[in-house]
Amino acid sequence: MLTELVAERIELGMDNIPSALNFIREGKIRAIGVTGARRSAVLPDVPTVAEQGMPGFEATAWFGVLAPAATPAAIIARLGAELDAIGKEAEFRSRIAGFGAEPPGLTPDGGSSPESFGVFLRAEIARWTDVVRRADIRVE
């Protein structure tokens, strides 16, 4: 989609910031709004969609680490602790922020845990299930 937008074969598109950031910085496309709850640290002058008249609008991309359901609790705890430690490292946070991604932050200390991710994941599933149901979206 971005190549079509840069080539002006389409007039509007939506993509995530890391994918579009270089095109924005080079002036090849213009960012109109961000879909998160707050402005992006790498695009602070670009207002949120909610700020532009659609209150409550929020749609973001996120990544998570998942394991098979039968994975022993001790392994999940160890993986969670290691991932949380990495997510709090200044170098990691700086590196992903540099290409427009936002670091994890599901717990009060700015980290994450298997439990906090589980809460987040269940909320996302419920939220998007409701959107699909209300919009009567069907698989074709």
Locations of the language-model features?
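Conserved, function-defining micro-sites of small-solute handling proteins
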Residues: M1-E140
